[in-house]
């Protein structure tokens, strides 16, 4: 617990990080396709994407991360550049990317978990919840200095979680 507290104590208020999750789609059928490893490997040759690209549980999904921005505008600038590069990379490899919330017809049973220790552990521990997690979304992380302050902010947000969920489910 001490190490978690140290991380929060070293944080900077109101820094922002953005993560976008994209479905990897076959260009002809628009069905999910298991091409994460290929895209991730190709991204290693790009100095921006090498740091920005990450896996997110299933092989038909790819994520880009802005890194820590000093403010929202800074994070958006970084994310836009990485997104443009990732879309170009996907087009060069003959796949489409989409942020669809969930995929409308690709069966969750056909999705494969990325083969790493971490994701094998997630699949083992969460099973059905992990298997059904075929979602593609955007996350915004906001830095709050101090563990106690971060908990206090979460406590204050709890009464409006329903409204935040409604806004995010558009």
Protein language model annotation of sequence segments:
Residues 140:
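An acidic/histidine-cluster motif and surrounding catalytic segment
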Residues 69-72, 143, 147:
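Short strand->helix junction
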Residues 115, 144-170:
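Loop-rich catalytic cores of soluble enzymes, especially ATP-dependent carboxylate-amine ligases
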Residues 1-129, 134-136:
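Terminal catalytic/cofactor-binding subdomain
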